[in-house]
Amino acid sequence: MLKVSAPWLASLRDELNQTCFLAVWGNKGPTVVYVEASMGAVTLVTQIGSVLPLLGSSTGLVFDSFLNERETAALREQEMPLLSADQLRDVKLHIEQIRTTGVHQIQGLLMPGINAASSPLFAMGNKLVGVITVVGPGSVLNDETQNLAARRLLQTAQAISERMGGSRPSD
């Protein structure tokens, strides 16, 4: 998957001039395994080996939307008590939206001033194998540019998934 994804992420980074990364589901949750850093500021959340929150990051929410509940249950149970009732409602709405659109955009969820968009990668059997994310400062990745980034990210995720023989499962 990394070999297939890397050139696409480099191209997306060049087009958007924003940091792009690939995360896989590791034994502690969403884990960054590959980063194409932008020429601008590199954020702390985009280091290889970083483990991201399941319910508190765009990347994590995409994993939670498409992985089997048994795979995410332990981490979800760990994180849910840290969220308010409003935040838990938002998580549910985000998951419904992600399953429908195949992309998730968020502003400042994990770190204030840092915006992100994430999209799932599927392989044969339409199995979720990773999530790609574009991340950048809110001053640059604002509503208009974030929408463009999300569209290009979704197109890139679909192309990578097709290359691996998969596609987003339909409900």
Where are these regions (language model features)?
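Extended hydrophobic
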Residues: S84-A157
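Cysteine/selenocysteine-centered motifs that mediate thiol-based redox chemistry or coordinate metal-sulfur cofactors
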Residues: E71-S84, L88, A157-D171
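Short, solvent-exposed cationic patches
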Residues: L54-G60, N147-S167
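Amphipathic alpha-helical effector-binding/dimerization core
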Residues: M1-R76
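Short helix-to-loop capping/linker segments positioned immediately adjacent to catalytic or ligand/cofactor-binding
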Residues: W8-L12, C20-F21, Q78-D86, T101-G108
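Residue-level marker for beta-strand->alpha-helix junctions and adjacent short loops that shape enzyme
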Residues: N27-G29, S139, S167
